[in-house]
């Protein structure tokens, strides 16, 4: 009888191990670099920082031969395909601009919203033209909106399309105003941390300086 109890105990212990769930990451960062081919990761390997791409290549997981069949290869379609896992006929983004109801429209243009942080036309943007959910949207749904999803980029489409419909905040750069903005699709006013960043006027500072390469110019190919 003792042997039977011992056997049951051991089996239960193994069951507990088998059902143990891996610890979920607290932060997921998605980075898309325009026009950076996959082979550049290795071509310029010696120039990466130890805690950046080198760490990802050394400790991360590489998904190779992953192809999404679409054309043309433009920014808006690329972001939409990567972050939705679908193609233009499914996610609805057919270009940086495309014909909708007989008119050429910006892929993220939306006249039903208002700019926040600017008075210019750069703020009339939202993800309404995107027909499906993104990774960020699914993360929000899976956690009952407890997850925080934020999109930031210089281009509006590069910030809006990856973040999706249910992001907590999406910010892009208005090159006319010289600051980061958003639209009423997401919020009615900019967070204080965005206002503080804008007040630093870094764009003006950088434009007044001479552009220098990180390494000697003759070492670039």
PLM feature segments, named:
Residues 37-43, 68, 121-127:
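Second-shell loop/turn segments in exported
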Residues 32, 37, 49-53, 78-79, ...:
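Stable alpha-helical elements in mature extracytoplasmic
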Residues 38-42, 75, 159-163:
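Extracytoplasmic/secreted cell-surface and envelope-processing proteins
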Residues 1-23:
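Bacterial Sec-dependent N-terminal signal peptides
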Residues 41-90, 148-152:
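Short, structured active-site-proximal loop/turn typified by the sulfatase FGly-forming signature C/S-X-P-X-R
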Residues 87, 95-221:
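His/Asp/Glu-rich, glycine-adjacent segments
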Residues 23-25, 74:
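A generic fold-level signal
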Residues 26-37, 56, 82, 139:
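Beta-strand elements within well-structured catalytic alpha/beta cores of enzymes
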């Amino acid at each position: 009888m003792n042997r039977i109890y011992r056997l049951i105990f051991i089996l239960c212990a193994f069951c507990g191990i088998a059902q143990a769930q891996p610890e979920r990451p607290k932060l997921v960062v998605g980075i898309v670099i325009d026009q950076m081919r996959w082979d550049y990761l290795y071509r310029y390997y010696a120039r990466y920082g130890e805690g950046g791409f080198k760490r990802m290549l050394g400790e991360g997981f590489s998904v190779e031969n992953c192809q999404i069949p679409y054309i043309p290869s433009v920014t808006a379609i690329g972001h939409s395909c990567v972050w939705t896992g679908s193609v233009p006929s499914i996610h609805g983004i057919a270009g940086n601009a495309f014909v909708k109801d007989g008119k050429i429209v910006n892929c993220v243009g939306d006249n039903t919203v208002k700019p926040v942080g600017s008075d210019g036309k750069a703020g009339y943007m939202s993800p309404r033209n995107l027909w499906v959910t993104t990774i960020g949207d699914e993360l929000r749904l899976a956690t009952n909106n407890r997850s925080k999803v934020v999109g930031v980029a210089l281009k509006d489409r590069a910030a809006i399309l990856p973040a999706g419909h249910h992001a907590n905040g999406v910010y892009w750069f208005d090159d006319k105003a010289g600051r980061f903005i958003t639209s009423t699709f997401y919020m009615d006013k900019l967070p204080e941390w965005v206002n503080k960043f804008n007040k630093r006027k870094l764009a003006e500072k950088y434009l007044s300086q001479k552009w220098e390469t990180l390494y000697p110019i003759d070492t670039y190919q």
